[in-house]
Amino acid sequence: MADNGVIGRGNGLPWHLPDDLKRFKALTMGHAMLMGRKTWDSIGRPLPGRRSLVLTRSAGWHAPAAERVASLEEAAARAGAATLFVIGGAELFSIAWPIIGRLELTEVHAAPEGDVWLAGFDRADWRETFRERHDADARHAHPFSFVTLVRR
């Protein structure tokens, strides 16, 4: 999430941070990921080593290597006791906040233009347990921080 709350632009991310992608892979590998259909479309393919649950109202929706779910409850039931990563987009986050207990966030220290913002996020509801700052460099146009938040 950028300093201005932006999380997307043009059905993608408004930044390219290779270390963020590497961390995302490390965190989610071997786990189930819940995403909205637009997020699935923006990724464009199943991510290896991870189970993809796609929340959509379209009963006829189907994609190879993805499981369609119609509700948060169905997604939680399918994930069982395993960790379920809610990876976006904005519409899904807006309804999933009540079930999210831990947030692995990348704060991008920039204010890019965007067309998707993280709605419903209130920092006062969370306690920071981890922060690791990274400066801009040849591979990363913006400074950023990896942050872990747990619900108060």
Question: Which residue stretches match the model-derived regions?
Answer:
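Flexible, gly/pro- and Lys/Arg-enriched active-site loops
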Residues: 1-152
